[in-house]
Amino acid sequence: MASASTQPAALSAEQAKVVLAEVIQAFSAPENAVRMDEARDNACNDMGKMLQFVLPVATQIQQEVIKAYGFSCDGEGVLKFARLVKSYEAQDPEIASLSGKLKALFLPPMTLPPHGPAAGGSVAAS
C-alpha cells in the first residue's frame, strides 16, 4: 500500500468542498489565528510584507490540512490544491464561495480606484 504522499491528489468537487471547509476552519483554530494576527501585524498592510510574512504562515496552515488528502506538504502541494480548486470554481458556486472566503483570510482587501465624475475627474463650477 502506497503512502498518501506518493499518490496523486485527485479530489472530486464534493471532496474539494470538504477540504476547503477544513482549511478555512484551520485558520480559526486559536493557535493559527494568533500566528496569522502576528504575521498581519508584521506586514502592516504592505503588499510586499504580506508576501514575506502572511503568505508563508497561510501556506503552512493549508499544508497541515491538505497533506491528509494526498497533497505534498510543501508549497507545490498548496499550488496543486489551489489549481484544483480553481478548476472547480466555474462549475460550482459553493466552491467559488469557499475559495473566496479562503483567499480573504490571507489576502488584503483590494480597493479599486474610484471611476467617473465623482472621482474628482471634473472641476467643480463656481
From Swiss-Prot:
Report the residues modified as N-acetylalanine.
Answer: A2
- What is this protein's tissue specificity according to the annotation? Ubiquitously expressed, with higher expression in lung and fetal brain.
Recite the UniProt keywords alphabetically.
Answer: Acetylation, Cytoplasm, Disease variant, Intellectual disability
Q: Name one GO cellular component term.
A: cytoplasm
Biological processes per GO annotation: camera-type eye morphogenesis; cognition; corpus callosum morphogenesis; post-embryonic development; psychomotor behavior; regulation of skeletal muscle contraction; third ventricle development
**Which InterPro entries does UniProt cross-reference here?**
P_C10 (IPR026317)
Q: Where in the cell is it found?
A: Cytoplasm
Tell me the function of this protein.
Answer: In brain, may be required for corpus callosum development.
Disease named in the record = Temtamy syndrome: An autosomal recessive syndrome characterized by intellectual disability, variable craniofacial dysmorphism, ocular coloboma, seizures, and brain abnormalities, including abnormalities of the corpus callosum and thalamus.
Instruction: Please give the family membership noted in the entry.
Output: Belongs to the UPF0456 family.
What name does this protein carry? Protein C10
What is the organism field in this record?
A: Homo sapiens
Gene label? C12orf57
